[in-house]
Amino acid sequence: MAAIRKKLVIVGDGACGKTCLLIVFSKDQFPEVYVPTVFENYIADIEVDGKQVELALWDTAGQEDYDRLRPLSYPDTDVILMCFSIDSPDSLENIPEKWTPEVKHFCPNVPIILVGNKKDLRNDEHTRRELAKMKQEPVKPEEGRDMANRINAFGYLECSAKTKEGVREVFEMATRAGLQVRKNKKRRGCPLL
């Protein structure tokens, strides 16, 4: 029997950890060098609740230069991973300011998983010192949960691509969200533009 196919699109600020999360999940390796993404696609197989699912992972550019290009990724999306970085309170602020309006415009009714990336940096001394200089601190778990409720996300998870903590759980939750949608409505995902 062929695997069920689901399309996952990941969005969030530039350098918030989107590509690392996808590569660690799909290839089990952590990229040490940061190269800004324009568009990348990965395929990964996952088994959830006894179902084989083939996930098409669509990586997107967070940089503003690509705001007009990014919507090309959205048609037929089954689930959105909306990311921020735990070491960047500004990236969390952009969730309701930028990412939620964009996603809800192009993908109404598509479930959103809010993901706090770079969890390993929450207690990192250097990170805390740098943020303190700007009178900031790492994002707290409850701030992430509150934001997930505020944007009506399907769920909220935190992970670290570097240590791999929580990575699999993110994609399991995303797959479940994508599968649930199929049961609830016949027309799937984002409409064509």
UniProtKB/Swiss-Prot annotation:
Annotated GTP binding sites: 12-19, 59-63, 117-120
InterPro entries: P-loop_NTPase, Small_GTP-bd, Small_GTPase, Small_GTPase_Rho
Location in the cell: Cell membrane; Cleavage furrow
GO cellular component annotations of the record: cleavage furrow; cytosol; plasma membrane
Organism superkingdom: Eukaryota
Listed GO MF terms: GTP binding; GTPase activity; protein kinase binding
Function (record text): Regulates a signal transduction pathway linking plasma membrane receptors to the assembly of focal adhesions and actin stress fibers. Serves as a microtubule-dependent signal that is required for the myosin contractile ring formation during cell cycle cytokinesis. Regulates apical junction formation in bronchial epithelial cells.
Taxonomic placement: Eukaryota, Metazoa, Chordata, Craniata, Vertebrata
Assigned keywords, A-Z: ADP-ribosylation, Cell membrane, GTP-binding, Lipoprotein, Membrane, Methylation, Nucleotide-binding, Prenylation
Covalent lipid adducts (S-geranylgeranyl cysteine), residues: 190
Entry keyword Transmembrane: no
Gene Ontology biological process: actin filament organization; apical junction assembly; cell migration; mitotic cytokinesis; regulation of actin cytoskeleton organization; signal transduction; skeletal muscle satellite cell migration; small GTPase-mediated signal transduction
Main localization of the protein described in the UniProt heading: membrane
Propeptide regions on this chain: 191-193
ADP-ribosylasparagine modified-residue sites: 41
Family assignment from sequence similarity: Belongs to the small GTPase superfamily. Rho family.
Sequence motif: Effector region, positions: 34-42
PTM annotation (Cysteine methyl ester): residues: 190
NCBIfam families with a match to the protein in the record: small_GTP
Name of the protein described by the UniProt record: Rho-related GTP-binding protein RhoC
Membrane-related topology note: Lipid-anchor
